[in-house]
Amino acid sequence: MVKYISYGIKKEDSDEENYEYFEKEVHLDKFITLTLINEEEYLKEKNNRIGFITYDSLNIKKKDGVIVLPCEESMVVYKDTEEDNEEEEYEYYTYVGQIESINKYILSGSYYEAWDAVLVDKKTGISEKILDIPYLLPDKKHMFCITPSLYEESTDFSLYSINEANKIEKIFETTFTKWQCYDVENMKDTIFVSKNGYLYVPVIHSSFFWEDIDKKQCQYLKIGLKK
């Protein structure tokens, strides 16, 4: 676990599109709670998981490396870089679906030794990059992102807020150095938000990450907003 995190502070003279971030030590439990639970509770809440993404990739298809997103005020285009480009300039986009409750398209972006997710507003066409595919909470005002850092054998985690205009703002981002997501190839099935508003994550100690999946000692975390 980490004891402190870094989070963003917006200067008074900064506009909403231009943030300046500063390092400041704050306790993690200022924002979230993390609870180790047993497998029985995890499986029980898995029956109450919330499906908030509409996977409609058959409706929006990539053609010749180009994805076109129809928005009310504009058409938004995402184009992959050519294969003969320098590796450092590599960009590859995949349409994932949409989150109808906050009026966003979702794309996953792959780059040279990096990846993220892109949320595109279906009205304005304005895009916002976030850590990874999000987990929207039932209040529709917050979302978590969690993604494994394979090279560092750690886990990156972030919390975002959503205002009335559906604008996304990052509250904090941190790295957990002692645990990894269990079975990273199936995170879509194993990590979920329940109706009770908590994120449920199977985890393992980082030292077991490269072992065969059957030998990994899986535990379960329940992550929620600080009340």
Regions found by a protein language model. Name each.
Residues 171-189:
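Conserved blade-ending motifs and adjacent loop-strand segments that build the rim/top face
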Residues 95-132:
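Acidic/His-rich structured neighborhood in mature extracellular/periplasmic domains
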Residues 64, 114-118, 152-161, 200-224:
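Structural motif
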Residues 123-155:
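Mid-length scaffold segments of soluble, non-membrane domains
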Residues 96-101, 134-145, 184-186, 190-199:
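Blade-terminus and WD-like Trp-Asp/Gly-His loop motifs, strongest in beta-propeller folds
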Residues 121-124, 162-165, 226:
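Short loop/turn segments that connect beta-strands within beta-propeller blades
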Residues 128-135, 167-177, 222:
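Beta-propeller fold detector
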Residues 1-109:
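Terminal domain-start segments
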